Amino acid sequence: MIQNPAYQQMVLDTFCTALEDASPAVRAKAAEALGKIGDISIAPILVKTLKDTSPEVRRSAIQALGQLKDEASIPHLLAAGQDSDNFVRQSVAEALGNIGSKVAISALLKLVEDSNYDVRKSAADALGKIGSEVAISALLKLLEDSNSAVRWSAADALGKIGSEAAIPTLLKLLEYPDAEIRQVSAISLGKLGNEDIIPVLIHLLEDSNAQVRESAVDALGNVAQYRVA
């Protein structure tokens, strides 16, 4: 970290100048660098950059705002959630998850219905980080998504939120052909700590996939911890 205030200002001024560079790559790198500084007072500069003509630059500015965890920038990020670029919308979901404010939930609930699966996945991840039960209904719906990565993130998010309303659907996913889905479902069930799932987890030790069996053992360990507590 730069200790000399004069040098700090010099570097900041340089980055701000670079945000006006003719090259989108340079502007994007400048936005990224501003996020690394970690000073929340820089957020207004990055908010202005959300209107850059280059999607690459907008993505970098969004990611930087997520790093700063600036709640004041949330309204601007919500607006960016309507961007025409898939990667920009994905970055919005990730940034909102990093900030972790429940104010962002309404926007994330819209993003889980996005036409792009990467956006839906990132929105599910973000909802898991925020951990509000308001998201449960939408996440349960995502367990039926056509994309396996989205289903994985939805199951993982439900485990983080810790609602037993997810148990019936998670149990169904233990029979899913995709081993990764069976694995994350077992992990999520273990996080819920309901002892009634113990027989199911024991049966899962007969799964053909070693990682699924490993996750079943891990989940059983988590349930056992709940019982001891």
Question: What spans do the regions from the language model cover?
Answer:
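Core register positions within helices of long alpha-helical scaffolds
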Residues: 2, 33-36, 64, 95-98, ...
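Eukaryotic tandem repeat interaction scaffolds
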Residues: 121-125, 148-159, 170-173, 179-187
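Amphipathic alpha-helical scaffolding segments comprising HEAT/armadillo-like alpha-solenoid repeats
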Residues: 5-18, 39-51, 70-82, 101-113, ...
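A generic tandem-repeat structural signature
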Residues: 54-98, 114-125
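Short inter-helical turns and helix N-cap capping residues of alpha-solenoid HEAT/ARM repeat scaffolds
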Residues: 22-23, 53-54, 84-85, 115-116, ...
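Eukaryotic acidic, serine/proline-rich intrinsically disordered low-complexity regions
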Residues: 1-8, 25
